[in-house]
């Protein structure tokens, strides 16, 4: 192409002559003026910006995420703060990469390890965050996973669950969140090694390492084991946030030993619950390694948040206060039948006590309420005269029948 000075030549795009513009560029039987070039450049720049903006995720601030978690999750203030900051930084990192600003700086992703007893809210925290961010979310159980060559589930099947949660939209899946539960159950052990199933744990940790740190994985769309000539879906895990959780029963003893506070003999059972929780807050990478996770695996989980054991008061709040509180749900279910449901304070305390006795935490609350409500929910729809049901402590303990108020009783 060259600049031409022939005044009779017109721009092939806007029709302006050489005299009307500053420059006219000639090609093979085609001409373009400087104004059309400038306009084309602006259009291209705007389209490029739109593409970059489409790759950018709208991320809530840590405070906004924390406030959202508070609407659904009772207690666990430290864990909620740690999660909010870690998730914010993770998606900010993705946006930073998409914007191609300061390409010489590589931001590494920060996967998260949640440590806390059963029923303390580990899974629910991750699930609630993913929902608030509108990103695909999948849950996997570490105990079902094995390394290649053993009987069990390939680690790539975790990614299949995320793909399914995103309706096989690969781009969305590659920005999703995966929660792997019971990660403490794959802590390496030296005994009971099987030739058909990897129960030592280390092999599974090694297999998980690659997808957690970031790799392009081949996922069988139908699940199961990989087979030769099988069609695979390629998914890049570098922007998938992995949150792993476990109870890590006994790790507080490892912390006590490190801190030089090991209690020997009869007095070992005299430690208060709050003391156990305080030891959990002191966990460092060294303790997790002694428990059985390999250093390379721990290194891919730089954010560690410890959840506290839920108290009776916490469980009562969980029953009644969050937006999706169980008591609110059951009240609404009976309200559909025009029946008011009331739980006395003693009933709520009894439900919380049962959950603590069963060591199920918040996870076990629904099953306890179901036991109490099953006969009520069976009978009430058949009795239009019932207007109110009252649940007392004795009802929860199985020592009395619920009080049913009928229309005739009010007259």
Curated annotation (Swiss-Prot):
What single Pfam family name could you report for this chain, choosing any that match?
ClpB_D2-small
Q: Give Gene Ontology CC terms.
A: HslUV protease complex
Per its UniProt entry, which superkingdom is the organism in?
Bacteria
Gene3D superfamilies (alphabetical): 1.10.8.60, ClpX chaperone, C4-type zinc finger domain (6.20.220.10), P-loop containing nucleotide triphosphate hydrolases (3.40.50.300)
User: Mind telling me which PROSITE patterns this protein's record contains?
Assistant: CLPX_ZB (PS51902)
Q: Which residues bind Zn(2+)?
A: 11, 14, 33, 36
Xref: SUPFAM superfamilies: Glucocorticoid receptor-like (DNA-binding domain), P-loop containing nucleoside triphosphate hydrolases
This entry's Gene Ontology molecular function terms read: ATP binding; ATP hydrolysis activity; ATP-dependent protein folding chaperone; protein dimerization activity; unfolded protein binding; zinc ion binding
Q: Which UniProt keywords apply?
A: ATP-binding, Chaperone, Metal-binding, Nucleotide-binding, Zinc
Where does this protein hold ATP? 117-124
Q: Which GO terms describe its biological process?
A: cell division; proteolysis involved in protein catabolic process
Residue ranges spanning the membrane: these are none
Q: Domain ClpX-type ZB spans what residues?
A: 1-52
Question: Which CDD domains does the entry mention?
Answer: RecA-like_ClpX
Function according to Swiss-Prot or TrEMBL = ATP-dependent specificity component of the Clp protease. It directs the protease to specific substrates. Can perform chaperone functions in the absence of ClpP.
PANTHER family registered for this protein in UniProt: ATP-DEPENDENT CLP PROTEASE ATP-BINDING SUBUNIT CLPX-LIKE, MITOCHONDRIAL, ATP-DEPENDENT CLP PROTEASE ATP-BINDING SUBUNIT CLPX-LIKE, MITOCHONDRIAL-RELATED
The subunit field of the Swiss-Prot or TrEMBL record says: Component of the ClpX-ClpP complex. Forms a hexameric ring that, in the presence of ATP, binds to fourteen ClpP subunits assembled into a disk-like structure with a central cavity, resembling the structure of eukaryotic proteasomes.
Q: Which family does it belong to?
A: Belongs to the ClpX chaperone family.
Return the NCBIfam families for the record.
clpX (TIGR00382), PRK05342.1 (NF003745)
Name of the protein in its database record: ATP-dependent Clp protease ATP-binding subunit ClpX
The upper taxonomy is: Bacteria, Bacillati, Bacillota, Bacilli, Lactobacillales
Name of encoding gene: clpX
């Amino acid at each position: 192409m060259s600049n031409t000075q022939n005044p009779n030549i017109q721009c092939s795009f806007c029709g302006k002559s050489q005299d009307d513009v500053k420059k006219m560029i000639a090609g093979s039987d085609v001409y373009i003026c400087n104004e059309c070039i400038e306009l084309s450049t602006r259009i291209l720049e705007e389209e490029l910006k739109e593409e970059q903006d489409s790759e950018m995720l709208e991320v809530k601030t840590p405070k906004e995420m924390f406030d959202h978690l508070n609407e659904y999750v009772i207690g666990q203030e430290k864990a909620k703060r740690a999660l909010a900051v870690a998730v914010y930084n993770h998606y900010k990192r993705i946006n930073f990469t998409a914007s191609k600003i300061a390409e010489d700086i590589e931001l590494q992703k920060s996967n998260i390890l949640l440590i806390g007893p059963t029923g303390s809210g580990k899974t629910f925290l991750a699930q609630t965050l993913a929902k608030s961010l509108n990103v695909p979310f999948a849950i996997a159980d570490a105990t079902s996973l094995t390394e290649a060559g053993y009987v069990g589930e390939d680690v790539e099947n975790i990614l299949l669950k995320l793909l399914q949660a995103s309706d096989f939209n690969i781009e969305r899946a590659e920005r999703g969140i995966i929660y792997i539960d019971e990660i403490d159950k794959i802590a390496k052990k030296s005994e009971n090694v099987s030739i058909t199933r990897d129960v030592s744990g280390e092999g599974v940790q090694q297999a998980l390492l690659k997808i957690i740190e970031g790799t392009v994985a081949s996922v069988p769309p139908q699940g199961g084991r990989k087979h030769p000539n099988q069609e695979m879906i390629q998914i890049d895990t570098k922007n998938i946030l992995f949150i792993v959780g476990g109870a890590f029963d006994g790790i507080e003893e490892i912390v006590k030993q490190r801190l030089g506070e090991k209690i020997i003999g009869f007095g070992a059972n005299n430690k208060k619950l709050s003391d156990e929780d305080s030891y959990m807050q002191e966990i460092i990478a060294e303790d997790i390694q002694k428990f059985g996770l390999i250093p390379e695996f721990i290194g891919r989980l730089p954010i560690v948040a410890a959840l506290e054991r839920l108290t009776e008061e916490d469980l009562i709040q969980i029953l009644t206060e969050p937006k999706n509180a169980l008591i609110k749900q059951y009240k609404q279910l009976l309200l559909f039948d025009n029946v008011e449901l009331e739980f006395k304070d003693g009933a709520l305390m009894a439900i919380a006590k049962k959950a603590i006795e069963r060591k199920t935490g918040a996870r076990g609350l629904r099953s306890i309420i179901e036991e109490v409500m099953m006969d009520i929910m069976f009978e009430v729809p058949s009795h239009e005269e019932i207007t109110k049901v009252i649940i007392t402590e004795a009802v929860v303990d199985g020592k009395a029948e619920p009080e049913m108020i009928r229309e005739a009783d009010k007259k």
